[in-house]
Swiss-Prot record:
It is an enzyme of class 7 (translocase). It is found in: Mitochondrion inner membrane. Its EC number is 7.1.1.2. HAMAP family: NDH1_NuoH (MF_01350). It comes from the Eukaryota. GO terms for cellular component: mitochondrial inner membrane. It catalyses: a ubiquinone + NADH + 5 H(+)(in) = a ubiquinol + NAD(+) + 4 H(+)(out). Belongs to the complex I subunit 1 family. It comes from Paracentrotus lividus. The keyword Protein transport does not apply. The chain crosses the membrane at residues 4-24, 73-93, 106-126, 150-170, 175-195, 226-246, 256-276, 303-323. GO terms for molecular function: NADH dehydrogenase (ubiquinone) activity. This is NADH-ubiquinone oxidoreductase chain 1. The lineage of its organism: Eukaryota, Metazoa, Echinodermata, Eleutherozoa, Echinozoa. The keyword Mitochondrion applies.
Length: 323
């Protein structure tokens, strides 16, 4: 019976995530449409609200094709792994009560999010296409490069709070958000999450003018839909993660259910809208600019912030002044 409740709890958490992903695709197309002085999808259902379901149905009833020279097992295993990792990480987020609560939950999130690199590289290599492989190599290099800055920023917050537990880090912001007291770190974090999720202006893995569609160029039907769903689930997840560690989670409604869940949802929605605004407003970076930004700008700043944090904590023996 306990296992049944655990499975039901997992499903009750994941179904809203999948619905949020479905409507995020619609919101993105609507936002981009209005920013470009057009309406966006408005035919399927009232105001185009049924468009995500029409798109999903179309993708999943299409024939699943595989290139004749592709690796048969890895080609289909990669999208499944990518999707599984995207959904697994949601269970560690302290929204009301985390489904999986560990003392080292922050390290687990960092480790599991790094595993998505293997799914991307596997899909690029298994397709046996030069465009797929170039896109996969770009994605891996980009993800690994920006994860270093993200890890150093997280290390600074770990030293401030003396904890690896996401719930504790969230509750430590009861009087002030880390986004206010560590504003430069929050800026670096936000831009790095754009690169980590392969979003514009860092979407070089899917540079249409160069490599068609990147690592998923040979995918069609269901496997392509899995990549698409996982990609958008990761966008919402990274913004939820940002809310938890920088924007105080459900504060000021910490103990008031369901207000605490609604507060987290509102903050996450605002950050997701920023992602969409950046996509509409900024052109794509060149690859050398992308690497210059992380290795010569963000990495030195992250290391400097870490050294400053260690110095302040050792000198004063207290947390950073939160104001």
């Amino acid at each position: 019976m306990t296992y049944l409740f655990t499975v039901l709890e997992l499903l009750s958490f994941l179904v809203p995530v999948l619905l949020a992903v479905a409507f995020l695709t619609l919101v993105e197309r609507k936002v981009l449409g209005y920013m470009q002085f057009r309406k966006g999808p408005n035919i399927v259902g009232p105001y185009g609200l049924l468009q995500p379901f029409a798109d999903g149905l179309k993708l999943f009833i299409k024939e699943t094709l595989k290139p004749s020279t592709a690796s048969p097992y890895l080609f289909f295993l990669s999208p499944l792994l990518f999707m599984a990792l995207a959904l697994l990480l949601w269970n560690l987020m302290p929204v009301h009560t985390p489904t999986l609560n560990f003392q080292l939950s922050l390290l687990l999130v960092l480790g599991l999010s790094s595993l998505s690199v293997y799914a991307i590289l596997g899909s690029g290599w298994a397709a046996n296409s030069k465009y797929s492989l170039i896109g996969a190599i770009r994605a891996v290099a980009q993800t690994i490069s920006y994860e270093i800055s993200l890890a150093l920023i997280l290390l600074s917050l770990i030293i401030i709070t003396s904890s690896f537990n996401l719930t504790y880090i969230m509750n430590a912001q009861e009087f002030s958000w880390f986004a206010l007291s560590c504003l430069p770190l929050f800026y670096i974090w936000f831009v790095s999450t754009l690169a980590e999720t392969n979003r514009a202006p860092f979407d070089l893995t899917e540079g249409e003018s160069e490599i068609v569609s990147g690592y998923n160029v040979e995918y069609a039907g269901g496997p392509f839909a899995l990549f698409f769903i996982a990609e958008y689930a990761n966008i919402i997840l990274m913004n939820l993660f940002s809310v938890v560690i920088f924007l105080g989670g459900p504060w000021p409604a910490n103990e008031l259910f369901p207000l605490n869940v609604l507060t987290i949802g509102l903050k996450t929605t605002l950050l997701v809208f920023l992602f969409l605004w950046v996509r509409a407003a900024y052109p794509r970076f060149r690859y050398d600019q992308l690497m210059f930004l992380t290795w010569k700008s963000y990495l030195p700043l992250s290391i400097g912030a870490l050294c400053a944090t260690i110095t302040i904590v050792l000198t004063l023996g207290i947390y950073l002044p939160l104001f």
